[in-house]
């Protein structure tokens, strides 16, 4: 019997369908000589710091650095049942072989190996390595299973990555949290990402607007523009001089240019475009692509490749033909795909680029949720663009001299519209969504006029236009994903498995964590660092805020995965880094002590002592330590009346002793009514309230 372990239930179901395994059990499927079960993402993780001793349960400077030896592992509490199922299956006497069918990559290898070792399994295992959930790809993968030990070095690199992230993340987070008296999450990927947002925010804040002017001449129906002129009076003087002069063409340059089709999507590219066009967050796009993958309509989404493997040519041609018939914007388009330019096995790592699958033939796109349909269409459109002809045009630049000043006119003559025609067709269906990117502020891109050297225009009409220099734009998820992808790439081995900050699969989670931690806030599509976010990057050392650390790690991990470096050497360097970090920050400077001090929201005066009453997470309390006045947000009085004890109600009670509230619930009648909540404080341990109705009928209850 062969036990197959997938990364998630949906993948296990697809494997079972391809292998004809139909008998469903509790946590697995059985049939035809196969047992098919699954993890639920990570089932086993590195244990928390507290597992290594009582001294680590409380955060303190004296307990740092924490350097586990030996390492301990734990099963996620909410996934214990599935782990026990896998453990029991591995121990079955009729199971002779285990197949690692977790995602083909470094993280998938780690997920399987941790479960395998935690279960105490020593049976031989093999590796399934596929990029598509189509039946043909699954069957081919099972026919070409690799020995598990062939991926030992990959597992070693994955485990080193996890341990290194643990050591630096745990120690840096505890160190700076203890120093500043506030939980400050620090991570190898999220902290440099936050730094990029903070740097952009600082550039915007320090930006000083400058006005400049451009003089524009009418030369035979085309427009020639001057360089930028700072002074408005100088621009006006030039305009008048030009209108009294002759504009002479001094040079004409015609250049044949080719704009190649865009490459196929990797996950980051898909997330960028979906954010720009539809406003989807990176996490939303990943979730939608994953849902389509599990429906077998899209290939594996967590990829950093922009190409297909060389053997996928025929499949891609068939898929392109399906797309032409399925996508409305292709109706009437003359299109013959050139798939060859999308094929390059040497540029495919774990998984090929994201494209629709042959299941498209049977799919009813109209039946899909709109958001899933948008992502599938986006991926399909990109395959068609990538397989279309290049966009070829002649770029014409004509230079004129007038009033001893140079003016430039630009134009283009399109010779072959190519993939741009398909892109225009697609964008026309987007109904108000953004057009193609580009900024043509100072050049008029039209059909190129015909100019000749020596051609002149007497007293040309002229005008002056005023412009303001623009500050950098706040990062959107689209621009931040691009920045994360490029960060540190110049210092990273071209053959490294991961380049930039994070992986295609984890970048969305990094952004979400920054938002959830309160270091970043969303304003529409924009990502803006909060005050705490800006302060955090200011207090951390460059080693933690620069992508250089990730570049160095990835280079080392790549060598480990190749078997060219020892994991022990890498880990010794990580431990030394943690020791040096703790040693460098024994205390805070005076100007840093109050950086993260919470500003208390004062909502009124205490009725007992006259001190300030502030809002806490669970209550409203008097800030004077010797005063016991406190109003609890979850007070039974409010809960029974199904009324949220809001700051507005609390402020009214403190200001006037009463607050008018609508739709109070009556536990006796089950109906709602309007009335006033009256503060009836007697100075005891608990604060009392009562209801006052319009007809002066009162109901008193102690909280």
State what each model feature region is.
Residues 1-3, 101-104, 181-183, 254-263, ...:
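Conserved short loop/turn motifs at secondary-structure junctions
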Residues 124, 194, 298:
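Conserved ATP-binding/catalytic motifs of P-loop helicase motor domains
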């Amino acid at each position: 019997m062969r036990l197959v372990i997938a990364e998630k239930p949906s993948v296990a179901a697809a494997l079972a369908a391809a292998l004809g395994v139909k008998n469903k059990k509790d946590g697995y499927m059985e049939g035809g000589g196969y047992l098919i079960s699954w993890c639920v993402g990570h089932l086993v993780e590195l244990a928390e710091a507290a597992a290594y001793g009582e001294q680590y349960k409380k955060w303190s400077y004296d307990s740092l650095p924490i350097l586990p030896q030996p390492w301990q592992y734990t099963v996620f509490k909410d996934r214990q049942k599935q782990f026990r199922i896998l453990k029991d299956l591995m121990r079955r006497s009729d199971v002779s072989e285990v197949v690692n069918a977790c995602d083909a990559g470094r993280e998938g290898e780690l997920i399987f190996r941790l479960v395998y070792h935690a279960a105490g399994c020593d049976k031989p295992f093999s590796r399934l390595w596929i990029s598509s959930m189509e039946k043909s790809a699954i069957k081919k993968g099972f026919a070409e299973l690799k020995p598990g030990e062939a991926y030992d070095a990959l597992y070693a690199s994955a485990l080193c990555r996890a341990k290194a992230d643990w050591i630096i993340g745990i120690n840096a987070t505890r160190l700076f949290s203890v120093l500043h008296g506030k939980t400050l999450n620090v991570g190898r990927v999220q902290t440099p990402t936050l730094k990029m947002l903070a740097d952009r925010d600082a550039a915007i804040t320090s930006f000083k607007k400058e006005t400049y002017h451009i003089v524009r001449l009418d030369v035979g129906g085309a427009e020639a523009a001057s360089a930028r002129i700072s002074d408005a009076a100088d621009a006006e003087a030039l305009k008048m001089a030009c209108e009294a002069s002759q504009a002479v063409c001094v040079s004409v340059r015609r250049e044949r240019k080719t704009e190649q089709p865009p490459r196929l999507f990797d996950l980051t590219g898909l997330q960028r475009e979906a954010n720009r066009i539809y406003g989807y967050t990176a996490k939303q796009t990943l979730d939608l692509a994953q849902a389509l993958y599990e429906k077998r309509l899209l290939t594996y989404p967590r990829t950093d490749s922009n190409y297909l493997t060389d053997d996928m040519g025929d499949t891609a041609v068939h898929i392109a033909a399906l797309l032409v018939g399925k996508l409305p914007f292709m109706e009437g388009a003359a299109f013959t795909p050139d798939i060859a330019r999308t094929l390059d096995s040497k540029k495919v790592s774990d998984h090929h680029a994201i494209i629709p699958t042959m299941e498209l033939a049977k799919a009813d796109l109209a039946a899909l949720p709109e958001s899933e349909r948008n992502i599938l269409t986006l991926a399909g459109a990109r395959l068609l663009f990538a397989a279309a002809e290049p966009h070829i045009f002649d770029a014409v630049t004509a230079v004129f001299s007038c009033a001893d000043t140079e003016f430039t006119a630009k134009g283009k003559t399109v010779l072959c519209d190519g993939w741009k025609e398909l892109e225009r067709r697609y964008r026309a269906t987007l109904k108000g969504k953004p057009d193609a990117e580009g900024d043509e502020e100072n050049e008029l891109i039209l059909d190129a006029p015909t100019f000749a050297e020596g051609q002149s225009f007497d007293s040309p009409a002229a005008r002056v236009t005023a412009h303001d220099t623009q500050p950098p734009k706040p990062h959107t998820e689209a621009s931040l994903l691009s920045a994360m992808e490029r960060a540190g790439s110049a210092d990273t081995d071209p053959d490294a498995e991961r380049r930039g900050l994070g992986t295609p699969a984890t970048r969305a989670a990094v952004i979400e964590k920054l938002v959830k931690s309160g270091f970043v806030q969303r304003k529409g599509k924009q990502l803006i660092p909060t005050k705490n976010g800006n302060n955090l990057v200011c207090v951390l050392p460059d080693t933690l805020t620069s992508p250089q650390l990730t570049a160095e790690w990835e280079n080392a991990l790549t060598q480990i995965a190749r078997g060219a470096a020892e994991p022990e050497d890498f880990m010794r360097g990580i431990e030394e880094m943690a020791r040096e970090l703790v040693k460098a920050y024994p205390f805070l400077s005076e100007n840093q002590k109050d950086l993260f001090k919470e500003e208390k929201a004062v909502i009124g005066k205490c009725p007992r002592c006259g001190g300030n009453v502030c809002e806490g997470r669970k209550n409203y309390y008097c800030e004077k330590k010797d005063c016991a006045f406190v109003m609890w947000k979850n007070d039974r009085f409010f809960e029974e009346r199904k009324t949220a004890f809001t700051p507005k109600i609390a402020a009214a009670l403190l200001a006037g002793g009463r607050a008018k509230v609508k739709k109070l619930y009556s536990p006796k009648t089950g109906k709602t009514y309007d009335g006033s909540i009256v503060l009836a404080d007697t100075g005891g341990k608990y604060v009392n309230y009562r209801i006052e109705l319009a007809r002066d009928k009162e109901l008193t209850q102690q909280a």
